[in-house]
From Swiss-Prot:
Upper classification of the organism: Eukaryota, Fungi, Dikarya, Ascomycota, Pezizomycotina
Biased composition (Low complexity): 25-48, 77-101, 348-360, 627-637, 917-932, 1181-1195
Any single Gene Ontology cellular-component annotation: plasma membrane
Segments for region (Disordered): 1-157, 282-305, 343-377, 614-641, 794-864, 886-1087, 1099-1470
Coiled-coil regions listed in the entry: 633-758, 963-1159
SMART domains per UniProt: EFh (SM00054), EH (SM00027)
Record-linked SUPFAM superfamilies: EF-hand (SSF47473)
Domain WH2: 1437-1454
CDD domains assigned: EH (cd00052)
Protein name, entry field: Actin cytoskeleton-regulatory complex protein pan1
Glycosyltransferase is among the record's keywords: no
Source organism of this protein record: Neosartorya fischeri (strain ATCC 1020 / DSM 3700 / CBS 544.65 / FGSC A1164 / JCM 1740 / NRRL 181 / WB 181) (Aspergillus fischerianus)
Keyword set includes Repeat: yes
Domain (EF-hand): residue spans on this chain: 201-236, 491-526
Alphabetical list of Pfam families matching this protein: DUF1720 (PF08226), EH (PF12763), WH2 (PF02205)
Designated gene of the protein: pan1
Length: 1470
């Protein structure tokens, strides 16, 4: 029965050498092998069980062990390995799963008598062994070499694609990295340096590359870091700059891959060997598809004896319930240990000499070995008892060992020394009263070796913490509580944030028990010096999360597969016809083998009417467990008692009931037919309404917009947009290349020009440096060449060429030109970037507009149903196809009408001749474009673009370029042919549709004509019909069936015709699409050519405009300079002449003062005619400058202020008096603030004239100076020049001592010597009228030698002053402007007429306008009136008068003060 079991125990018949029994313990003793081994024939190895050497006579040998041929070995490992063999033991001992068995004496202090000297033969190997090694230790070691250590698989690089390099480069880098590092995971610095130096980059660049690549700062490079270094080297080699910091995307990719490599554990599992009796621990785990890798221990542990012992599972050495007891011949000499009795652990009922090997247990002198007596194991024996050399070990402290997959929770090799500081951490984090007051983190930190996975003890501590804080048993801990717990660890806030992120992957804001354990474990690792990982390693993923993710993935896969199946079978359109079951199954792995497979559910239920049966008495409820009761006896008796008459009566009643049922059925059939006809009529009416609505939609003006949602067109437009978007970078790069070439050409052209302009300059040196730069060697060669040329010229007698230019000047010129070229290039580059950005934004907007928004599965289903006629009846399908054909026909017609109207508009547009209204037709046509086809829109866009180009070229004065590829007539002919073709197709479709409609109407009429006959022939009379009616109904049914067959045949024929028509339409549609695509390509080519020509023309226009502007600016500059020079010369000459005339006039006046004795009253009356006549006579020789005044006259005539036409010249002349811009600004400000009427209009009128050309003050001043020579030689404006400086009262008070007196005179009228002098001066000029008039102008000119510019105002008032000045004062109501005008016009306006003949007639009317405005009298009469009484005092002040006349300002001040005293002047005039 057990004959074959020995093959698994390594015996003689063992067919698997090298595979010992699982977990068998070899003997261990301090004695030689010869003394331990007792010859025996059993199949077990002797096994010590007990203490050291004792007296052999004290204990009775106890037989233990099993017979070789009848007993199976006992398994103490994983319980699921050999369950059948364990069940075959006859009442034997059953080892409980995972239950360690102790075969020695419990640990206690050992008396000295038991001490045994340690042997020297103790094996020194204490390293842990795997289960395979322990199993191999039981086999024969002769000729069987120990298994070789697993070969290193080399550096493992994760199969992760780096986005910043290509796949080919990554493969090359992987090969290079593996060849450089061998079996290591990292590349040391020296090897990396050797590889990086091959790039021949400078050391500074390689240093930057190393700093950026070594992300871990470890002095070594992982593969992703090495790939990053290669990528950066490639960047630098290609000429691009290195980034200061790595982009976040690259940094995250490199860090993630480094973490994956760091967390990875090499797979050291040996190869699968032949099947042995060793139980397979992986069998129950085969279904786990996502087993995590083995955990990586940061620091390897040196296993201890306790660990070694704990890895060995004890074996039962016999059957448990066996008789034990002391043998009668055993003396009690054990002392305190006398209670231990030898126990019989063998198989009772067998001869000890035959089957069992004696095995003493308890205290004995020589431990006897039991077990298999086979070949010696190749490994040292393992101790299983309390040996003398292990006296210091405590065998009681055995640690439970993992029996699952490494890396799972609670199954990790904990450190031998335990987890330090874990209890302190627990006490620190436990909820305590008064913890708010503060806490200390002392004693929490350390440097212990902590694995990635969570041990059982650690998990238990964390669970206790969780339960302690989860007082309400919610199953989770909130964020606030977690902050309080984790904050007591003393870690930084950033580390705690990262730990929380890792522990709460779903971002729920709370932690369950497993997630809390993960957080605490990470905190514990951080306190012991381990960094917080960037991502959670597989060992720390909670089982609940892992299982949930697997479940979710399985559900998703099931749903996706179900959706794919339904989509492929069309189940989502007709769910009841697919046979797909929608019953919810609770098993993810059941599939077709699940118990519920094949059974029908409610989603597929269909009632089987034929299976329905009538009443069965056997289906009644049975009473109790008895058999079916018999029918009631009463009914049997009643049936037996019925007579013949009663039976006949029952038959008649039954017949009546059957006839009534037939009648009801026929009535119901009629009602159903009526309802069917009504429904059919309603459906037809609905279809008619639908047709009418569709026709209204097709004929509506805005019907074109509904075609915008065409999916095919959207996709075509998206593809076209993508093609254009792909061309943008190419065009931009081409533009940049052309810009570089232009810049280089400009620089080279400048070098050539500079070399031609400066022959001996250093600019003609040809640079040999990078980029054509001139190096120092080039300069040295050029200087040497120049010296040689100079020597050659000296020897030849030629003059030595002098170097008029040095190296610095040439370099500066070249640098300036390079800077300007660079600036232009940067500006163009910025424009290019702006264009790219705008194109990108426009592309994004187009993409957003082309996206199919709101496209859900329900909407897709409905659209396919009603637009593609899927999942509907045949009648509805035909109706939908009919509507689509009608829509296409109407669309073609509308398109032709819109095109015809557009052509009419285009023909009418040029005839109208209005270029500005041209966009209106294009806007109108654009409104109808969305409804038209793609080709029409392209053609319309091309036409609009050509029209805009023609308008721009016409505006620029260029002749538009006509496209010679296709003339207008050819294009019109082609479009006409296409239009006729489309009309013909539309008419054919209309004819087909009409024929179909007529055929359908004829069929309906036939069906309606046949339909009434059926109910007439079938409807019976009201009386109960006979049974014959059933045969008639059967005949009618056959007729119906024949009619249905004919209808079906006709319908099949119609479907075939419709199908052929659809195929023909599809072929026609494909042909039209191909033609449209060809036309579109042709149009695109034409558009590109047109755009190229347009760009060239625009560039020519722009260059022409620039040249014209440059020429115009140069001409204006030359004219302005010439005018300025001419004006300056004319002003100087006029000033000299005025000074001479003024001086002569003053001399004559002084002589006249001595000779004249006229009264003061006569002076004012005679001054006005005296001033007017000589001024006119004086203007005769100076009329020559009147010609250039036409421009100012036209400007002044066009000014809005015509009423004060004479004020502008005054202001203009006053402004040209000073060339200081600050004085002009202050003077204008003072003029605007003066309250007196005369100066008010001057700045107001002057400022608009100055602003006509430019707002720049310097430009305006230049214009004023350029107009100076136009107004030279005007004598009568010298009084105006005296009146002008009154605005300078407060600014030029330091001019002379008379200015202060003038200021006083402003305050008190009639006082001051200046007024007296002026009255004396003007009074003495009365008798010699012509002479005094001429002298009056000369002294006035000489009195203003510095401010000569008032003369320039002369020509301007001549035309305006002679005609409009006298009429200007009376009309305007406001006093200030008229006051200013008559104040000048009464005395000065009559003198300056443009022509001498006009002056005498204009002189007499001048006094009449003077009296009406008393507030504004003429300035000359006013001083004598105000200073009339003190006139005699003027004689002694002649020297002061001359000084004031020479000063100029004082004399003008007098006149200004006289104007302010308008009341006295009015009295004098009266």
């Amino acid at each position: 029965m057990y004959s074959s079991s020995n093959s698994f125990l390594g015996g003689v018949n063992n067919a698997r050498p090298g595979q010992p029994p699982f977990m068998q313990q070899p003997p261990y003793s301090q004695f030689p092998q010869g003394q331990q081994q007792i010859p025996q024939q059993t199949g077990f190895q002797p096994q010590p069980a007990g203490y050291g050497p004792q007296s052999a006579s004290h204990l009775q040998p106890q037989p233990t062990g099993f017979p070789t041929g009848q007993l199976q070995p006992q398994f103490t490992g994983f319980p699921g390995a050999a369950p059948q063999q364990q069940q075959q033991q006859l009442g034997g001992y059953q080892a409980p799963a995972q239950q360690p068995q102790f075969t020695g004496y419990p640990p206690q202090s050992q008396p000295p008598s038991l001490q045994v000297p340690s042997t020297t033969g103790l094996p020194t190997r204490l390293a842990p062994r795997t289960s395979s090694e322990i199993a191999n230790s039981f086999s024969d070691g002769a000729g069987v070499a120990p298994p070789p250590p697993p070969k290193s698989s080399g550096s493992k690089i994760p199969n992760i694609r780096l986005s910043f390099i290509t796949a080919q480069d990554q493969a090359k880098f992987e090969q290079l990295f593996k060849s450089a590092v061998g079996d290591s995971q990292t590349m040391d610095g020296e090897k990396a340096k050797e590889l990086l130096l091959r790039s021949r980059l400078p050391g500074s660049e390689l240093s930057k590359i190393w700093v950026l690549s070594d992300t871990t700062k470890s002095g070594q490079l992982f593969f992703p870091e090495f790939a990053l270094a290669m990528y950066l080297c490639n960047l630098r080699i290609t000429g691009r700059e290195l980034p200061a910091t790595l982009p976040d995307k690259i940094k995250n990719e490199v860090s993630s891959m480094v973490d994956i490599i760091s967390f990875g554990v090499p797979d050291t599992e040996p190869q699968a060997s032949a099947r042995t009796n060793v139980p397979s621990f992986d069998a129950p785990l085969l279904e786990n598809k996502s087993a995590p890798p083995a955990p990586q221990h940061p620091k390897p542990q040196q296993p201890s004896n306790a660990q070694f012992l704990s890895q060995l599972a004890a074996q039962p050495t016999g059957f448990g319930p066996q008789a034990t007891g002391l043998q009668p011949n055993q003396p009690s000499l054990l002392g305190a240990n006398a209670a231990l009795a030898p126990q019989a652990t063998g198989f009772p009922g067998q001869s000890q000499q035959q089957y069992l090997q004696p095995q003493p247990t308890g205290l004995m002198t020589n431990p006897q070995a039991t077990g298999y007596n086979g070949p010696r194991p190749p490994l040292p024996p393992m101790p299983t008892g309390f040996g003398s050399n292990l006296s210091s070990m405590q065998t009681g402290g055995l640690v439970a060992q993992p029996t699952g997959i490494p890396g799972q929770w609670g199954f990790v090799n904990a450190p031998s020394s335990g987890l330090p500081n874990i209890e302190a951490l627990k006490q620190q984090l436990m909820p305590q009263p008064g913890r708010e007051g503060g806490f200390t983190t002392a004693g929490l930190s350390g440097n212990a070796s902590i694995p990635w996975a969570i041990t059982k003890e650690e998990k238990k501590i964390y669970d206790d913490l969780f339960r302690a804080w989860d007082g309400f048993h919610k199953g989770f801990i909130g964020g606030d509580t977690a902050i309080e717990i984790m904050g007591q660890s003393g870690l930084d806030r950033k580390d705690l944030e990262r730990i929380w992120t890792l522990a709460d992957p779903n971002n729920r804001g709370r932690l369950n028990m497993d997630e809390f354990a993960v957080a605490m474990h990470l905190i514990y690792r951080k306190l012991n010096g381990y960094p917080v990982p960037n991502r959670l390693p597989p060992e720390l993923i909670p089982p609940s999360t892992r299982n949930l993710n697997d479940s979710i993935g399985a559900v998703k896969s099931l749903l996706s597969q179900d959706a794919e199946n339904r989509k492929a079978s069309g189940a989502f359109l007709q769910p009841q016809k697919t046979g797909v079951s929608y019953l919810k199954e609770h098993s993810f792995r059941g599939g077709a083998r699940s118990p519920g497979f094949g059974r029908k559910d409610a989603t597929l239920f269909k009632n089987n009417d034929e299976a329905a049966a009538g009443y069965r008495s056997s289906a009644r409820r049975r009473m109790g467990n008895d058999a079916r009761p018999s029918s009631p006896a009463a009914s049997q008796a009643s049936e037996e008692e019925l007579s013949v008459e009663q039976l006949k009566k029952k038959i008649r009643e039954t017949q009546i009931m059957l006839d009534a049922v037939d009648f009801n059925d026929e009535n119901r059939a009629e009602e159903d037919e009526v309802l069917d006809r009504r429904d059919r009529l309603e459906a037809e009416s609905l279809m008619d309404r639908t047709r009418r609505v569709q026709d209204d939609i097709d004929t509506h003006p805005n019907a074109a917009f509904r075609n915008l949602d065409n999916g095919a067109e959207r996709r075509a437009l998206r593809r076209q947009l993508q093609a254009f978007e792909d061309q943008v970078p190419q065009v931009a790069s081409e533009v940049r290349r052309i810009e570089r070439e232009i810049a280089d050409a400009k620089l080279e052209l400048f070098r050539l020009k500079d070399a031609k302009a400066h022959p001996n300059s250093a600019a003609n040196i040809v640079g040999t440096g990078p980029g054509g730069t001139v190096t120092e060697a080039d300069r040295i060669k050029a200087r040497a060449r120049a010296r040689m040329q100079a020597r050659a010229a000296e020897l030849a007698g030629r003059p030595v060429p002098a170097s008029v230019d040095d190296d610095g000047a040439a370099a500066r010129r070249l640098e300036a030109e390079s800077t300007s070229i660079r600036a232009d290039r940067e500006k163009n580059e910025a424009m290019t970037r702006d264009v790219e950005e705008s194109v990108r934004e426009f592309t994004r907007s187009l993409e957003d507009s082309l996206k199919e928004e709101g496209e859900t599965s329900t909407r897709e289903h409905e659209r396919r149903r009603w637009e593609d006629a899927l999942g509907v009846e045949d009648v509805i399908r035909d109706f939908i196809y009919d509507l689509q054909r009608g829509s296409r026909t109407a669309h073609v017609r509308k398109e032709e009408e819109s095109r015809a109207s557009e052509q009419r508009l285009r023909h009418e547009e040029p005839s109208a001749g209005v270029s500005r209204l041209s966009p209106a037709p294009s806007a109108g046509s654009a409104g109808s474009l969305p409804g038209s086809t793609h080709e029409d829109r392209v053609a319309a866009a091309r036409e609009r673009a050509q029209r805009r180009i023609a308008e721009r070229m016409a505006a620029a004065g260029l002749k538009p370029h006509t496209d010679t590829s296709e003339t207008l007539l050819q294009r019109q002919e082609r479009e006409k042919r296409e239009r006729e073709e489309r009309l013909r197709q539309a008419e054919e479709e209309d004819a087909k549709r009409e024929q179909e409609r007529q055929r359908r109407l004829a069929e309906e009429q036939r069906s309606t004509s046949n339909a009434p006959a059926k109910p007439v022939g079938k409807k019976p009379p009201p009386a109960p019909p006979s049974r014959r009616g059933r045969t008639d109904s059967a005949g009618q049914a056959e007729v119906k069936k024949a009619a249905e067959e004919t209808v079906t045949a006709e319908q099949a024929a119609r479907e075939q015709a419709i199908r052929e028509e659809q195929q023909a339409q599809e072929e026609e549609t494909n042909r039209l699409e191909m033609e449209a695509q060809q036309r579109e390509e042709e149009l695109l080519k034409e558009k590109e050519a047109q755009e190229a020509r347009l760009r060239a023309l625009e560039e020519q226009v722009r260059q022409g405009k620039i040249r014209k502007q440059e020429e115009k600016r140069r001409k204006e500059e030359a004219e302005r300079l010439a005018k300025e020079k001419e004006a300056a010369l004319a002003a100087q000459r006029a000033e000299i002449e005025r000074a001479k005339e003024r001086e002569r006039q003053l001399q004559l006046e002084l002589e006249g003062l001595d000779e004249e004795s006229s009264s003061d009253d006569e002076g004012p009356a005679n001054i006005t005619p005296e001033d007017s006549t000589p001024t006119q006579s004086q203007l005769l020789p100076t009329v020559t400058p009147a010609a250039p005044v036409s421009a100012p006259e036209s400007e002044q005539a066009g000014s809005p202020e015509d009423t004060s036409s004479q004020a502008p010249p005054v202001g203009f002349s006053s402004e040209t008096e000073s060339k200081n811009p600050y004085f002009k600004i202050t003077h204008q400000a003072a003029d605007t603030q003066v309250v007196s009427p005369p100066p008010a209009p001057q700045p107001n009128v002057t400022s608009p004239r100055a602003d006509v050309h430019s707002t720049n003050p310097f430009h305006r001043l230049a214009q004023q100076e350029s107009s100076k020579p136009v107004f030279t030689g005007s004598a009568p404006l010298e009084r105006k020049s005296r009146a002008r400086p009154e605005a300078d009262d407060d600014w030029s008070a330091a001019g002379s001592e008379f200015d202060s007196s003038d200021d006083d005179d402003d305050e008190r009228p009639g006082g001051g010597s200046a007024k007296q002098l002026a009255s004396i001066l003007f009074g003495t000029m009365a008798p010699p009228r012509p002479l005094s008039a001429m002298d009056d102008k000369s002294p006035s000119k000489s009195s203003t030698p510095v401010q000569d510019s008032p003369v320039t105002s002369l020509p301007v008032p001549e035309p305006n002053g002679s005609l409009s000045a006298p009429a200007a004062p009376p009309p305007p109501p406001p006093p200030p402007p008229p006051a200013a005008v008559p104040s000048y016009d009464s005395s000065v306006a009559p003198p300056p007429p443009p022509a001498p003949p006009m002056a005498p007639p204009m002189a007499p009317p001048a006094p009449p306008p003077g009296p009406p405005p008393p507030p504004g009298p003429p300035p000359p009469p006013a001083p004598p009136a105000a200073g009339g009484p003190p006139t005699p005092a003027g004689a002694p002040d002649r020297s002061a008068l001359l000084a004031s006349i020479q000063m100029g300002k004082g004399l003008r001040k007098v006149q200004t003060n006289d104007r302010s005293t308008s009341s006295s002047a009015g009295r004098v005039l009266d």
